[in-house]
């Protein structure tokens, strides 16, 4: 710096303290006489050198103004910015990201931080004029903080934890840039002092999680009204009076949420409603388990009981070879009594008639938790098979003993002895056998995929599925198919196992037992003439048999009126219902089933 050019102004303490040297024409305001004279002196003049500051002092003075990215942005930011340069650095996306990352994993603020957060909210009211990125007005936030000091635990400003559950039952942790206590409420049902948790449910309007209470993670850069969202707590509730949606604010503030189990995880709104705050907050949430009222728009979710948004009738109507698609994710109101340890096969009305213990509550779904063993243990390895209980040969008590290999939920019905295991079709008598059930399905609209050709030269295919894969051999007649299936089912000791069950005495021979076992195991259509509807062939995937259940097919009740159901006696080569619910055979593991 000692050899600076002659025209530059020497750095005096006044000029350097103000933030850097000015040009020769502009620096004369502070020293009126000297700069005009000194500017004409050469750089090596002693008078000019005497007025100069040491380089070390200059570096110390200009250290905080030389660069934009100040190291302080890595720390939790204070409520008021220090300088305009630091303010710009704090609003940058990199600074916001670093601030968020530096605060992950910090412990919850102690209870003594309530007063601190109120003071910080008051300071936020002062700083909100300088910083336009504050998401709520400062005075309103301070007033809300003072009002809510006794209601809900106020949040520390430097503890934004996106994954922590709120200690007040659902209060959301705010970003450090947003106000300490949220004034983001529904425009129709409550006012700015509302608790940032769950609305207190009334008798007329079922509760919803407030979407306005979810503050997005980027709320530093949001507009002043950006975090205000209308919560789906509609005021035009159909099942109540005119003002049913208007909840009392005092009641909401006085009571905490009475149903923490119905709340969403974290504090975000229900993501099925797709509010702007719910999608921006990035927090996973579960839909509340309370039933949706008649006036609300239910989110379409297969795991939540609500309005009937699926083309399926109620569970009092039985289905051919299906359990109403519970494994396919239909609402649990169509599958009322599902319990892995009890009978998962009967509808709610039938299980009540049989005196069975009830299953899970109707609000639960078989897919909400982990995969239930009643569906996964008994699954056939055929990719299009959802278990032996989906076969139409089980209707009306026509079954076989080896189906217990598919069905682990059976033994609880063994003592009941009722011949009709499933809720019957309205047109189906209780004494309907398997062949009648097959002949009564001319089109079987559950299987809308593929081509169904009656005049197939080899209509009978072997659907045996072992550990090595499906067999897929084709035969012209059902007798040839059954004789081929005996090669699959011929195991040492199988006849003894089949004869050990009570219904085995009604069989004509062990060959008939093997045929019935093969027909039930492989979901094959029963023996029928090649042109009859029972021998239809599905060409497309794996040439599936008609009694296969497909989870994505349409409901078959559209053609239920045209079904001609003949009444056949139950006597014949079919087992009694006791045989279906015997213990799992030892041959089941040898056959490739689980």
Curated annotation (Swiss-Prot):
Residue(s) carrying Phosphoserine: 257
Protein's UniProt name: Zinc finger protein 703
InterPro entries: Elbow/Noc_ZnFinger, Tscrpt_rep_NocA-like, Znf_C2H2_type
A GO term, aspect molecular function: zinc ion binding
UniProt source species: Mus musculus
Subunit structure: Interacts with DCAF7 and PHB2. Interacts with TLE4; increases transcriptional repression.
Presence of keyword Zinc-finger: yes
Function: Transcriptional corepressor which does not bind directly to DNA and may regulate transcription through recruitment of histone deacetylases to gene promoters. Regulates cell adhesion, migration and proliferation. May be required for segmental gene expression during hindbrain development.
Residue ranges with Gly residues bias: 17-30, 345-356
PTM annotation (Omega-N-methylarginine): residues: 584
């Amino acid at each position: 710096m000692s050899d600076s050019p002659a025209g530059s102004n020497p750095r005096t303490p006044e000029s350097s303290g103000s933030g850097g040297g000015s040009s020769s024409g502009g620096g004369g305001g502070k020293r009126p006489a000297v700069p005009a004279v000194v500017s004409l002196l050469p750089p090596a003049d002693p008078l000019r050198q005497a007025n100069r500051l040491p380089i070390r002092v200059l570096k110390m003075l200009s250290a905080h103004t030389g660069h934009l990215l100040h190291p302080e942005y890595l720390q939790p930011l204070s409520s008021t910015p220090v300088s305009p340069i630091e303010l710009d650095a704090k609003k940058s996306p990199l600074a916001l990201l670093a601030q968020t990352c530096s605060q992950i994993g910090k412990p919850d603020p102690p209870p003594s931080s309530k007063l601190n957060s109120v003071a910080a909210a008051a300071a936020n009211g002062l700083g909100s004029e300088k910083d336009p990125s504050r998401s709520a007005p400062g005075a309103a936030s301070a007033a809300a903080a003072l009002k809510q000091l006794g209601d809900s635990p106020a949040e520390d400003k430097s503890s934004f934890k996106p994954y922590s559950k709120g200690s007040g039952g659902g209060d959301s942790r705010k970003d450090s840039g947003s106000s300490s206590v949220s004034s983001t409420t529904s425009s129709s049902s409550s006012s700015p002092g509302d608790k940032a948790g769950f609305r207190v449910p009334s008798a007329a309007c079922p509760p919803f999680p407030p979407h306005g209470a979810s503050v997005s993670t980027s709320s530093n850069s949001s507009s002043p009204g950006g975090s205000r969202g209308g919560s789906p707590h509609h005021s035009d509730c159909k099942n109540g009076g005119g003002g049913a949606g208007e909840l009392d604010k005092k009641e909401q503030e006085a009571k905490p949420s009475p149903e923490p189990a119905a709340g969403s995880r974290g504090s975000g709104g229900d993501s099925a409603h797709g509010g702007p705050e719910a999608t921006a907050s990035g927090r996973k949430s579960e839909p509340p388990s309370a039933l949706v009222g008649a006036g609300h728009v239910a989110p379409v979710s297969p795991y939540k009981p609500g309005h009937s948004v699926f083309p399926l009738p109620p569970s009092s109507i039985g289905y051919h070879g299906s359990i109403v698609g519970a494994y396919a994710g239909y609402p649990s109101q169509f599958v009322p009594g599902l319990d892995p340890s009890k009978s998962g096969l009967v509808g709610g009305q039938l299980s009540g008639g049989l005196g069975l213990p009830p299953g899970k509550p109707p609000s639960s779904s078989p897919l909400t938790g982990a995969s239930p063993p009643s569906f996964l243990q008994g699954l056939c390895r055929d990719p299009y098979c959802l278990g032996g209980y989906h076969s139409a040969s089980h209707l009306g008590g026509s079954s076989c003993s080896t189906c217990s290999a598919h069905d682990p939920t059976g033994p609880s019905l063994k003592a009941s002895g009722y011949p009709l295991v499933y809720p019957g079709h309205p047109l189906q008598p209780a004494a309907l056998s398997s062949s009648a059930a097959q002949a009564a399905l001319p089109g079987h609209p559950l299987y809308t995929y593929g081509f169904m050709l009656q005049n197939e030269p080899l209509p009978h295919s072997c659907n045996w599925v072992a550990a090595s894969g499906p067999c897929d051999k084709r035969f012209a007649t059902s007798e040839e198919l059954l004789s081929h299936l005996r090669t699959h089912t011929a195991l040492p000791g199988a006849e003894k196992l089949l004869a050990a069950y009570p219904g085995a005495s009604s069989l004509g021979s062990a060959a008939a037992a093997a045929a019935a076992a093969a027909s039930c195991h492989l979901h094959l259509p029963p023996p029928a003439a090649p042109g009859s509807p029972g021998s239809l062939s599905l060409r497309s995937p794996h040439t599936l048999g008609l009694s296969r259940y497909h989870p994505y097919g349409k409901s078959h009740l559209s053609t239920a009126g045209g079904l001609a159901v003949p009444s056949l006696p139950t006597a014949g080569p079919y087992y009694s219902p006791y045989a279906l619910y015997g213990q799992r055979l030892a041959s089941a593991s040898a056959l490739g089933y689980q």
